[in-house]
Amino acid sequence: SLQSVTIPNSVTSIGDYAFEQCYSLQSVTIPNSITSIGDGVFNVCKSLQSITIPNSVTKIGGGAFRRCESLQSVTIPNSVTKIGNRAFWECTQLDEPSRLRLKELNYTEN
């Protein structure tokens, strides 16, 4: 089962539902070549614990991290200008700094 992913520098976007339901996925390395994270990319990746989104990313798709129940920490740079609906829906373990950052970006669960 897939536990770790390093996306190569030649990739510029992560397509919709690319890693959906990879239940054992614990870590993902996203390079600075990525500009967008599609819809549902990490949907129901129940073992993913933290994610750092690089400064190159401007868009996080709807439901991108939906139901990532172990996700505790997310680092979102100022370059992100759009976060889709329910991108972090049911991420019940998110720490306070991550929640404050999402609030700062005017992200709401709708």
Regions found by a protein language model. Give the residues of each.
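Structural signature of tandem-repeat unit edges
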Residues: S1-S13, Y23-S36, K46-K59, E69-K82, ...
